[in-house]
């Protein structure tokens, strides 16, 4: 099993505070039933969100959704 580290995600989102916000927002989406962009397996929503960010499927744009 590949382990996801914060460093893997910081390559995609350089600001650690933006990374925290994006990962938390995406984890809430996944926990609420949104389909994952990576194979979820038996991982928790937070790990799935970090894997999506590290893979480049999700970025800071997730924070702008729903705004005009």
Curated annotation (Swiss-Prot):
Signal peptide: none annotated. Its EC number is 2.7.7.6. SMART domains: RNA_pol_Rpb6. GO terms for molecular function: DNA binding; DNA-directed RNA polymerase activity. Disulfide bonds: none annotated. Transmembrane segments: none annotated. The keyword Transcription applies. InterPro entries: DNA-dir_RNA_pol_omega, Pol_omega/Rpo6/RPB6, RPB6/omega-like_sf. One of its GO terms (cellular component) is DNA-directed RNA polymerase complex. The keyword Transcription applies. Pfam families: RNA_pol_Rpb6 (PF01192). Keywords: DNA-directed RNA polymerase, Nucleotidyltransferase, Transcription, Transferase. It catalyses: RNA(n) + a ribonucleoside 5'-triphosphate = RNA(n+1) + diphosphate. GO terms for biological process: DNA-templated transcription. Promotes RNA polymerase assembly. Latches the N- and C-terminal regions of the beta' subunit thereby facilitating its interaction with the beta and alpha subunits. Belongs to the RNA polymerase subunit omega family. The RNAP catalytic core consists of 2 alpha, 1 beta, 1 beta' and 1 omega subunit. When a sigma factor is associated with the core the holoenzyme is formed, which can initiate transcription. This is DNA-directed RNA polymerase subunit omega. It comes from Chromobacterium violaceum (strain ATCC 12472 / DSM 30191 / JCM 1249 / CCUG 213 / NBRC 12614 / NCIMB 9131 / NCTC 9757 / MK).
């Amino acid at each position: 099993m590949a382990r996801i580290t914060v460093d893997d995600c910081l390559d995609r989102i350089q600001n650690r505070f933006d990374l925290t916000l994006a990962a938390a927002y995406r984890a809430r989406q996944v926990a609420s039933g949104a389909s994952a962009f990576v194979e979820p397996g038996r991982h928790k929503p937070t790990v799935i969100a970090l894997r999506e960010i590290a893979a480049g499927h999700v970025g800071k744009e997730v924070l702008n959704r729903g705004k005009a």
